[in-house]
């Protein structure tokens, strides 16, 4: 159930990808790259929303916060469905993101209510394993809808999925935050919690690392349709190639769930970040030698490796960043999510809008983010701070 709720984020993003060009043309986008904003504005809504639902869920309980989020998501889906110009569409997408921030943020707190340390990383990895199968099939779903109906039918599908998921959540998931553990809403408490999160090296460092990973990934997502459908001329085969890459993240999350109890979160993250950074540096040099037009098989091979490494790191970085924040799990998850998304959205938009008919902007994004992650994680791991507990 939690994976399905998280998957609405992926479905709302990836089902759009095959339709971006058509939506942009129908709604009067002035430039081809402007269609990427349909993806980016959802992430922008996520960034703002996560700062609200964490404190709200600490005060009212987890379920009421999710109910509010789903209501906004459904309104945004309806607005996007009826949009007649790009500005209205972007407003609807922002509302969708604002609403989807609830399950994205609160579900981390729900898991933290019940687990911690490597056990939390293991649960999050299994959630991610199921969650990632949606990105694998979402572009195929979107492409299939386009073959038989208008792109607006994609938003009608999202509306239906939102209603079904909300009903399942309401009926099946019990409240995980007991009344005695709830904290009265207070701006002073929120400010204090933000200061605590941002002043704790472990939480801040791993949250920044999450933002850097998401920056490169958002840049890839925004330009994936243009790269595969236009540059490599895959046409309707684009969803298949996208699915293969999405499954690399899912398989990494599954593998991480199996290995994290044995090797520990820090070791797996350290190995993955080092390997992915070296590969990115080498592939960037190779891409330059091809004029930004590497053969498809080399591009796919590189992306499979990078996304597998990102899949290993993502669940572990989430768990390590949350480790010191158990006493403020709701607002802690909110600040983490908001900060990482506020880092990733502008950087991801910059990477996507830099698309120039070559893969150089996307590969540059992966390379630069990899180098910065190495620097940030080195800072976290070498400067004395409260240790992250884990079982090696």
PLM segments and residue spans:
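Cytoplasmic helix-loop-helix junction between adjacent transmembrane helices
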Residues: 92-133
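Helix-breaking motifs and short loop linkers at transmembrane-helix boundaries and internal kinks
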Residues: 29, 61, 82-88, 99, ...
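Paired small-residue
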Residues: 72-79, 87-95, 297-303
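Juxtamembrane intracellular "pre-TM" segments in multi-pass secondary transporters
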Residues: 174-206
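Helix-loop-helix hairpin linking two adjacent transmembrane segments in secondary transporters
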Residues: 88, 117-118, 122-171, 177
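Extracellular/periplasmic helix-loop-helix junction of adjacent transmembrane segments
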Residues: 19-48
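Conserved MFS/SLC helix-loop-helix module at the cytosolic interface between two early adjacent transmembrane helices
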Residues: 47-87
């Amino acid at each position: 159930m939690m994976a399905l709720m998280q998957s609405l984020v992926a479905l709302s993003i990836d089902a759009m990808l095959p339709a971006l060009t058509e939506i942009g043309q129908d709604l009067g986008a002035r430039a081809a790259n402007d269609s990427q904003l349909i993806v980016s504005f959802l992430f922008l809504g996520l960034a703002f929303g996560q700062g609200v639902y964490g404190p709200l869920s600490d005060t009212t309980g987890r379920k009421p916060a999710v109910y509010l989020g789903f209501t906004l998501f459904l309104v945004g889906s309806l607005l996007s469905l009826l949009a007649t110009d790009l500005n209205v569409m972007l407003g609807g997408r922002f509302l969708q993101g604002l609403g989807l921030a609830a399950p994205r943020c609160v579900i981390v707190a729900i898991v933290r209510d019940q687990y911690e340390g490597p056990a939390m990383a293991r649960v999050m990895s299994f959630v991610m394993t199921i969650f990632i199968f949606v990105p694998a099939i979402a572009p195929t779903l979107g492409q299939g809808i386009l073959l038989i109906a208008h792109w607006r039918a994609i938003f009608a599908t999202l509306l239906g999925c939102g209603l079904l998921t909300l009903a399942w959540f309401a009926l099946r998931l019990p409240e995980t935050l007991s009344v005695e553990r709830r904290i009265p809403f207070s701006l002073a408490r929120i400010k204090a919690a933000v200061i605590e999160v941002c002043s704790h090296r472990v939480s801040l460092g791993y949250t920044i690392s999450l933002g850097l990973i998401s920056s490169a990934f958002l840049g890839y997502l925004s330009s994936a349709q243009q790269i595969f459908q236009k540059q490599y001329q895959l046409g309707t085969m684009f969803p298949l190639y996208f699915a293969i890459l999405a499954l690399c993240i899912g398989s990494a999350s599954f593998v991480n769930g199996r290995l994290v109890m044995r090797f520990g979160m820090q070791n797996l993250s350290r190995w993955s970040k080092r390997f992915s950074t070296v590969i990115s540096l080498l592939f960037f040099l190779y891409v330059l030698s091809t004029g930004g037009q590497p053969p498809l098989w080399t591009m796919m091979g590189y992306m499979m490796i990078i996304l597998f490494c990102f899949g290993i790191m993502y669940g572990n970085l989430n768990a390590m960043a949350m480790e010191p924040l158990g006493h403020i799990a709701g607002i802690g998850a909110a600040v983490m999510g908001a900060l990482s998304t506020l880092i990733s959205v502008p950087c991801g938009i910059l990477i996507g809008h830099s698309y120039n008919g070559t893969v150089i902007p996307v590969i540059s994004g992966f390379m630069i983010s990899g180098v910065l992650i190495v620097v940030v994680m080195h800072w976290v791991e070498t400067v004395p701070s409260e240790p992250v507990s884990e079982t090696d």
